[in-house]
Amino acid sequence: MGGMITTTTPYIEGKKIIKYLGFVHGVASVYVTVKYYEDVKDAYERALRESEDTALIRMVDNAKKLGANAIIGINSNYAMVGEKGDMIMVGIYGTAVVVEEDG
C-alpha cells in the first residue's frame, strides 16, 4: 500500500494519532465473466478479489491526497448488482489519520 498503514481497529499499536483527516472511501465494481476453463464459484471469487483490490487502492489514494499515513476503522460493503447478479460492487471505507511513533 505504498507505506500506508491500514487497519480495521480504531487505533494502531505503538502509534499515536496526531491528526484525524476524515472519512475516506473507495468503490469498485467488476462484471463476473466465467471463462471456459473455470467454474462459476471461481469466477465470482476472482471478481470479488479484483473489486476488493481496486476499491482498497482507491481508498488509499484518497487518503494520500489528504496527507494521511494511515487509515483506521476500515470496513467494507458488498453487493451483487445487474439483472442477473453478474456484477460485484465493493465499497471500502475508513478514517484517514496521521500517526507517529508513540513514546
From Swiss-Prot:
Classification via InterPro entries: UPF0145_dom_sf (IPR035439), UPF0145_YbjQ-like (IPR002765)
Pfam families with a match to the protein in the record: YbjQ_1
Protein name as it appears in the record: UPF0145 protein MJ1413
Alphabetized SUPFAM superfamilies for the sequence: YbjQ-like (SSF117782)
UniProt family annotation: Belongs to the UPF0145 family.
Entries under Gene3D superfamilies matching the protein: Hypothetical protein apc22750. Chain B
Domain of life: Archaea
